[in-house]
Amino acid sequence: EITRLYLGVAENPLVDVIGHCATVGYEFDYEKCMKKFKECGKLVEINESSITWKNTSGNYREIIRLCKKHEVPVIVNSDAHFCTLVGRFDNALKLLDEQDFPERLVVNADIDRLTELITAKKSNILR
């Protein structure tokens, strides 16, 4: 059921980022969905808050492994729920480093790469 929902979301042209996809208890066929996310040009969010507070490291390890395998770009996000945590992604970066995840696939690791993506996806946003 959850796999089917993610496959449907992947086909939605209004969705650019697949967020909170490592939630414990809501696992899905990661392999099948990462392939579909790649095919549909989606980014996968690596969510610091979920890693830190919701014990999603195991699921994220598998998701990151598959994103690397299928060259699915990711976007790292603090998802801060308190002002002092804005911009903190220590655990997310650690998981990416553990997998030797290519920096070129981390969209927001480079401002030019991020701007290019935003411009391509939503050309009228930056005007």
Predicted regions and their residues:
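Charged catalytic cores and adjacent phosphate/nucleic-acid-binding surfaces used
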Residues: 7, 12-15, 25-127
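Histidine-centered catalytic micro-motifs
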Residues: 18-22
